[in-house]
Regions:
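C-terminal catalytic domains of large/alpha subunits in multi-subunit enzymes
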Residues: 1-198
Length: 198
């Protein structure tokens, strides 16, 4: 998956507008530019699906991630470790929060959440869907990996949906190592988090 489109696209457009402002300010006080507007534009060019070109570009930037799940002797998750490449972290604290939020969201997807539908309509109330409560969330170690990124947006790739992608596989593999049972559907069955189906 890609990083945050807004961080990359809007960030580069903003950087370009700021470069124009900086150029206009050369040797002048800011008050001389009162009322002047500066614009920046950035279009991230990608190739269409099925393009007959060598090495087609489907995303402008990619983020990479790895996650680890630690299951205790009682079968409950003790800790999640999530390392995510963000290029340059514009706001490291926000990146950590995004990682933690994605992990919690995907933990629910992997272990407890069930959204039953009948004829495309929900058959359960929101409060019964199995969302994790704050006191049920294990320790989450969020690792923001900064590495040189693109030459746009000051190297920021951003972070988005990728925070929730590796979580369920990490949890499934942790349970496989725990009890030797391969689980291939979500929510995972036969864990301390499993709910009795009605």
């Amino acid at each position: 998956t890609s990083g945050s489109r807004q961080t990359l696209i809007t960030g580069e457009a903003c950087r370009r507008a700021c470069a124009e402002l900086k150029k206009a300010m050369a040797g002048r006080p800011l008050s001389d530019l009162n009322g002047t507007e500066y614009y920046g534009e950035y279009l991230a060019k990608t190739d269409p699906l099925g393009a007959d070109v060598p090495n087609p570009v489907s995303h402008v930037a990619y983020g990479y991630a790895t996650q680890l799940c630690v299951v205790g002797e009682d079968g409950k998750i003790e800790r999640m470790v999530a390392a995510h490449d963000v290029g340059r972290a514009v706001n490291p604290t926000s990146c950590e929060g995004q990682i933690e939020g994605g992990v919690v969201m995907s933990m629910g997807f992997a272990l407890t959440e069930d959204y039953p539908l009948k004829d495309c309509r929900p058959t359960a109330k929101f409060g019964t869907l199995g969302l994790f409560k704050a006191d049920q969330i294990p320790d989450i170690k969020a690792i923001v990996v900064e590495k040189p990124g693109l030459d746009v947006a000051c190297g920021a790739i951003g972070i988005g949906e990728i925070t929730s992608i590796p979580t369920a596989p990490a949890i499934a593999d942790a349970y496989f190592r725990y009890d030797g049972k391969r689980r291939c559907s979500l929510p995972l069955e036969g864990t301390p988090y499993s709910r009795v189906k009605k």
